Amino acid sequence: MKKDFASVTPAGKKTSVRWFIVFMLFLVTSINYADRATLSITGDSVQHDLGLDSVAMGYVFSAFGWAYVIGQLPGGWLLDRFGSKTIIALSIFFWSFFTLLQGAIGFFSAGTAIILLFALRFLVGLSEAPSFPGNGRVVASWFPSSERGTASAFFNSAQYFAIVIFSPLMGWLTHSFGWHSVFVVMGIAGILLAVIWLKTVYEPKKHPKVNEAELAYIEQGGGLISMDDSKSKQETESKWPYIKQLLTNRMLIGVYIAQYCITTLTYFFLTWFPVYLVQARGMSILEAGFVASLPALCGFAGGVLGGIVSDILLKKGRSLTFARKVPIIAGMLLSCSMIVCNYTDSAWLVVVIMSLAFFGKGFGALGWAVVSDTSPKECAGLSGGLFNTFGNIASITTPIIIGYIVNATGSFNGALVFVGANAIAAILSYLLLVGPIKRVVLKKQEQDPDQSLPV
């Protein structure tokens, strides 16, 4: 239903509701990543209380990743079928509820507690699966192409902001009240956020505060403001055959591989980094919680700056390919610096180097902007889910591989080399595989999908 905004907003002057929407995505992503990091902050205490070695801890860390990957395509389908607002709200509620329940595992015997912890981490991962594809859909519908880099980088930078804010808080809670309190506090915070999301977020054409000028600005700039119209939802049942087209597109294959490599860096910082500070650098859990926030602060700054730089390049007439690839490649080059930590005994120099590496990781984390730029209009949620599936295989492999490396060598040196090598692989993927970045146009299903897209 059309609205008359003339009495509320001056003619021709567009509202800025889209920036409130991305702020809400920022809050959701902050809680999302804080809940992922609960176990990494409490990890040393949990490992001690439950009697886990490094390999077993690696598998517990990976429980989230198994479910998160499994849930990506169903989550993407749900987003396309029922819309972003409803599915994201349910996602927030359930991952927060399962986080809350983890606070009770201390009441069980060690053997039972380990099984429950793995199961609850698995359910958190399954519940979080629609979140990032949903974020990508929301940005694609609320933002023109010229602002998507900034918008995507802003909500994506929340993963670092979450560590800056919540790592010290969770470290203090663990130190003062025990590790169980971390899960209780974070679970309650997420449930409250789910309610706020339902009360404040709408589709572009249904938002009570957006005006026609802003809608026109978004749509004329390439925003998909009708993405969640009822007609679009009716068509979602026929989208599954498009998966083959997405999986045979050379550009997308390169983006998927690079995202796996970049996510490897993410999960080192989300899982083993605080443990590394405690076990390899001799810090207390409280110190590690505060120290882990410093690289994360740099990652936050890098994340915001990377998106801004990308959009500035685009507005100055550079191609979309150039504007997206330059920050990604530059950021991954900086991330490789973490390997230098193997050659110093200074804990504070390690923090400085990791801060530089995390800044680079944030600066180059433009994958979701690329997804918004390239996803077919017919299946944006499914495309984002596929992208996140490949990327988050790293959430399974990274904690396990690092666990085996540490267990076999008694050192984190090999682990840092492994993570740094993934940054190099991401660069090579964007340089050699991705090619020009552009929106994928799908062939209709009655045509041969093998000939739909160049590889």
Swiss-Prot record:
Known catalytic reactions: galactarate(in) + H(+)(in) = galactarate(out) + H(+)(out); D-glucarate(in) + H(+)(in) = D-glucarate(out) + H(+)(out)
Induction: Induced in the presence of D-glucarate or D-galactarate.
Keywords from the UniProt entry: Cell membrane, Membrane, Transmembrane, Transmembrane helix, Transport
Pfam families per record: MFS_1 (PF07690)
GO CC terms of this entry: plasma membrane
UniProt-annotated location(s): Cell membrane
Alphabetized InterPro entries for the sequence: MFS, MFS_dom, MFS_Na/Anion_cotransporter, MFS_trans_sf, Sugar_P_transporter
UniProt membrane topology term: Multi-pass membrane protein
Gene Ontology terms for molecular function: transmembrane transporter activity
Transmembrane segments: 19-39, 59-79, 87-107, 108-128, 153-173, 177-197, 253-273, 289-309, 320-340, 348-368, 386-406, 414-434
NCBIfam families per the UniProt record, alphabetical: 2A0114 (TIGR00893)
Family assignment from sequence similarity: Belongs to the major facilitator superfamily. Phthalate permease family.
Known role: Probably involved in the uptake of galactarate and/or D-glucarate.
Name of this protein: Probable galactarate/D-glucarate transporter GudP
Organism: Bacillus subtilis (strain 168)
Protein encoded by which gene: gudP
